[in-house]
């Protein structure tokens, strides 16, 4: 039998058959995908074959094959730094939910996510959530951040789950697609799913007043069928986003504004760091490239996985950019 993995708890997988029936399945022994060193061999979104095991009181299944994936998105494993964790597979879009505060989402985190999604062939749409909660200064910051990413070709949406702003536009994009919500804990992923599909009643939790960080409410990634013809994968909140399996020379290729300037650099293997006659650094000096994006690039290049909590909006360079672009 063939089906799609709707939920993974690490040892058991909920699979929906092509006939619409759900079955709890597991794997036997080691199950590895060719060329992929991951902590989880099977991910939500995978198309799998499975056999029924009817020898027990409760009928379960055993997964025997994973079909080739159209794509998948990964991050560095929390416990095993040299291995990856597959978040989900076979996606049409990923929606990265961003909040300016409660909790804050930094450009470093956004850029690391975008680099990984681009590397694995997944289109990302940035969703600025909770816009109804921002004061004037926060709205200015949100609009400036949106400007940075729209300028380099990323689609951006502004939504409010509580007031319903932007919900219909989001639903129109999701219709007949398999998509995923991702972002920090507390950015409102489950709340947004509930706003689109109130009958789901996904569990939500408020932000910790002490840490201003979200608290996990989604424990495992899980796919849901929505009434307007969409399939959404809700994922646990991500604190950091470690990048794996990427050579230094290829990183700039996943920054669209860097990639289009690469042929103008003096050296073919230019890392846009210390080299002379670098078109990217020249564009940076002329304010044609965002300083926050360049800073993120350097952090990724240096293998610094600890910068996702900080941002550089208070940097004088950023402040002057904001004033100039308004």
Curated annotation (Swiss-Prot):
GO terms for molecular function: GTP binding; GTPase activity; metal ion binding; rRNA binding. Residues 80-241 form the CP-type G domain. Its main location: cytoplasm. InterPro entries: G_CP_dom (IPR030378), NA-bd_OB-fold (IPR012340), P-loop_NTPase (IPR027417), Ribosome_biogen_GTPase_RsgA (IPR004881), RsgA_GTPase_dom (IPR010914), RsgA_N (IPR031944). Its EC number is 3.6.1.-. Zn(2+) binds at residues 265, 270, 272, 278. GO terms for biological process: ribosomal small subunit biogenesis. It holds the Pfam family RsgA_GTPase. Its cofactor is Zn(2+). Binds 1 zinc ion per subunit. It is an enzyme of class 3 (hydrolase). Monomer. Associates with 30S ribosomal subunit, binds 16S rRNA. One of several proteins that assist in the late maturation steps of the functional core of the 30S ribosomal subunit. Helps release RbfA from mature subunits. May play a role in the assembly of ribosomal proteins into the subunit. Circularly permuted GTPase that catalyzes slow GTP hydrolysis, GTPase activity is stimulated by the 30S ribosomal subunit. HAMAP family: GTPase_RsgA. This is Small ribosomal subunit biogenesis GTPase RsgA.
